[in-house]
Amino acid sequence: MILCSYWHVGLVLLLFSCCGLVLGSEHETRLVANLLENYNKVIRPVEHHTHFVDITVGLQLIQLINVDEVNQIVETNVRLRQQWIDVRLRWNPADYGGIKKIRLPSDDVWLPDLVLYNNADGDFAIVHMTKLLLDYTGKIMWTPPAIFKSYCEIIVTHFPFDQQNCTMKLGIWTYDGTKVSISPESDRPDLSTFMESGEWVMKDYRGWKHWVYYTCCPDTPYLDITYHFIMQRIPLYFVVNVIIPCLLFSFLTVLVFYLPTDSGEKMTLSISVLLSLTVFLLVIVELIPSTSSAVPLIGKYMLFTMIFVISSIIVTVVVINTHHRSPSTHTMPQWVRKIFINTIPNVMFFSTMKRASKEKQENKIFADDIDISDISGKQVTGEVIFQTPLIKNPDVKSAIEGVKYIAEHMKSDEESSNAAEEWKYVAMVIDHILLCVFMLICIIGTVSVFAGRLIELSQEG
């Protein structure tokens, strides 16, 4: 018996709930039918034709999809929050079961033809016709999503340490300011749901309302809302993948001058660095904006690195040529000896080349310094009279001539060897000078390319 009573109570509750749903659905159906009956969505929703429709526009930025530097297009995911009052869509909630808000298809009511003026590629107007929210006071809120591709003048002068000021210009396409007025919901777009980009960070963003008078209609204003977005690029990717490798190539080029010329690998290392740099530039060239409006910083640095490497090859050829010079082909000028052997090594703290002193060279035995007493076995004092029988001895005379020839030949070989060693020493001094000079050029060149822009960013930040 108790079980039966529970079943009855449940059945009664189910019937009452179904009746409520039917009545609620009936109220909403009747409300929508009454609102849209004789409704003309072409006519502006105003009580008098002299009145204007006041529309509040709010831009909600969801995502920065892509920045195309070459075509100067910025692709964004946005939501346009639009609010206005339609005087023909009002009702008394008491007459419709207390319903205060309903959702209607946006195709069934009047909509402002809000478009993106600086559209670059895609749809100017909103294409996703989502439902709108209607209040019993006639207030409409419509927040359709949109993918905008807006034109933005991309300035690549400071790439990859650049900032871009991009805009979105929104306005009513058909009506002038006397028919439809638009106002920004806030002086800043809504970034509460913005998804951070891995390449860009938003530094500032604002919106302004403009009254524009065109030449066709000088007395009638056309209204638009322009949103400005200042975006700063995150340069980490380009620093790690482009700038640091180029810097390493430059330092590797400097090491060419530290490599001894006798090793025979100077040109091999120089050409290898040049080929490696060329292949590297071919790989990363797609990362750099291919535009002729300006030369980006990273392009300047890559050009500097290429010139730096080629210059090192040219001067390496000069050093190798100097190293292999000989007295039979080149005579060392006095100014070269004075600068590169006597002056620069002392100034730059090089270890001077060990050469025989004049005293030692004078003490060496040559044909002109032969002691005749060593040959005759007698001590000879004073001048030697060469008409002695000793000199007239053919064997002794032949021996002296042979010793004299050998001594002169040895002297000539030693002078040639000393001259060749001097050329090698000059080449070594030039190598050390170029090592210091190219190291300074590498550091100063890198700093001069990037330092100015980095200082500007630090002051702005």
From Swiss-Prot:
Pfam families associated with the record: Neur_chan_LBD (PF02931), Neur_chan_memb (PF02932)
Subcellular location(s) of the protein: Postsynaptic cell membrane; Cell membrane
Membrane-spanning segments: 235-259, 267-285, 301-320, 433-451
Signal peptide start-end: 1-24
Disulfide bonds: C152-C166, C216-C217
Gene Ontology molecular functions: acetylcholine-gated monoatomic cation-selective channel activity; transmembrane signaling receptor activity
Cytoplasmic side: 321-432
Keyword terms, alphabetized: Cell membrane, Disulfide bond, Glycoprotein, Ion channel, Ion transport, Ligand-gated ion channel, Membrane, Postsynaptic cell membrane, Receptor, Signal, Synapse, Transmembrane, Transmembrane helix, Transport
Glycan-linked positions: N165
Recorded catalytic activity of this chain's protein: K(+)(in) = K(+)(out); Na(+)(in) = Na(+)(out)
Topology versus the membrane: Multi-pass membrane protein
GO CC aspect terms: postsynaptic membrane
Highest taxon of source: Eukaryota
Extracellular topological intervals: 25-234
Keyword Transmembrane part of the UniProt annotation: yes
Main function: Upon acetylcholine binding, the AChR responds by an extensive change in conformation that affects all subunits and leads to opening of an ion-conducting channel across the plasma membrane.
Family stated for the protein in its record: Belongs to the ligand-gated ion channel (TC 1.A.9) family. Acetylcholine receptor (TC 1.A.9.1) subfamily. Alpha-1/CHRNA1 sub-subfamily.
Classification via NCBIfam families: LIC
Quaternary structure, from the entry: Pentamer of two alpha chains, and one each of the beta, delta, and gamma chains.
Protein name (Swiss-Prot/TrEMBL): Acetylcholine receptor subunit alpha
Species of origin: Torpedo marmorata
